[in-house]
Amino acid sequence: MIPVVIEQTSRGERSYDIYSRLLKDRIIMLTGPVEDNMANSIIAQLLFLDAQDNTKDIYLYVNTPGGSVSAGLAIVDTMNFIKSDVQTIVMGMAASMGTIIASSGTKGKRFMLPNAEYLIHQPMGGTGSGTQQTDMAIVAEQLLKTRKRLEKILSDNSGKTIKQIHKDAERDYWMDAKETLEYGFIDAIMENNELK
């Protein structure tokens, strides 16, 4: 169930679902697994807010275990395409594809709450049973290409070398807020609405 907010206006009461009310303040909630429907919703909100006023920041709150690479990269490409600055605020976790999205916010405007976590690792994929050997080779080659592309994005977003990203992402690499700041994925830790 989605909570409803009731506001008093000069024309009487107006009710909004909470996400529509947040959108009015240029806040987008990216929560749950990254998949096509969620990505389409996030992209539509980014485009709408940018068309409304591209001189104001958009606030993207992130709490996701990650998910689809193609859906996540569609969000990242849209963030880079629009003129509005996109502030990212990680709460809970930004894991896997969530790290790519959260670290792709406008440099200087990437934040994290003190108890949130970041996770980087190599992309996952596979083939089902009954897959032909040739198809397995194609999938393996595509996974390697995807890994290189994601490592380049993480390197650009953090300032770390691709070699360092490759080494750290070999297995699950968890970071708390302080470690994420030191790594270069965020620009500050937010505590009580203040930057640390």
Curated annotation (Swiss-Prot):
InterPro entries the record matches: ClpP, ClpP/crotonase-like_dom_sf, ClpP/TepA, ClpP_His_AS, ClpP_Ser_AS
GO MF term list: ATP-dependent peptidase activity; ATPase binding; serine-type endopeptidase activity
Entry's localization field: Cytoplasm
SUPFAM superfamilies for this protein: ClpP/crotonase (SSF52096)
Reactions accelerated catalytically: Hydrolysis of proteins to small peptides in the presence of ATP and magnesium. alpha-casein is the usual test substrate. In the absence of ATP, only oligopeptides shorter than five residues are hydrolyzed (such as succinyl-Leu-Tyr-|-NHMec, and Leu-Tyr-Leu-|-Tyr-Trp, in which cleavage of the -Tyr-|-Leu- and -Tyr-|-Trp bonds also occurs)
Enzyme category, top tier: hydrolase
Keyword Protein biosynthesis annotated: no
Principal location class: cytoplasm
GO biological process: protein quality control for misfolded or incompletely synthesized proteins
One Pfam family of this chain: CLP_protease
EC number assigned by the record: 3.4.21.92
Residue numbers annotated as active site: 96 (nucleophile), 121
Keywords, alphabetical: Cytoplasm, Hydrolase, Protease, Serine protease
Cellular component per GO, a single term: endopeptidase Clp complex
The protein's assembly and partners: Fourteen ClpP subunits assemble into 2 heptameric rings which stack back to back to give a disk-like structure with a central cavity, resembling the structure of eukaryotic proteasomes.
Family: Belongs to the peptidase S14 family.
PANTHER family listed in its UniProt record: ATP-DEPENDENT CLP PROTEASE PROTEOLYTIC SUBUNIT (PTHR10381:SF70)
Protein's job: Cleaves peptides in various proteins in a process that requires ATP hydrolysis. Has a chymotrypsin-like activity. Plays a major role in the degradation of misfolded proteins.
Protein name: ATP-dependent Clp protease proteolytic subunit
Organism: Streptococcus uberis (strain ATCC BAA-854 / 0140J)
Gene coding for it: clpP
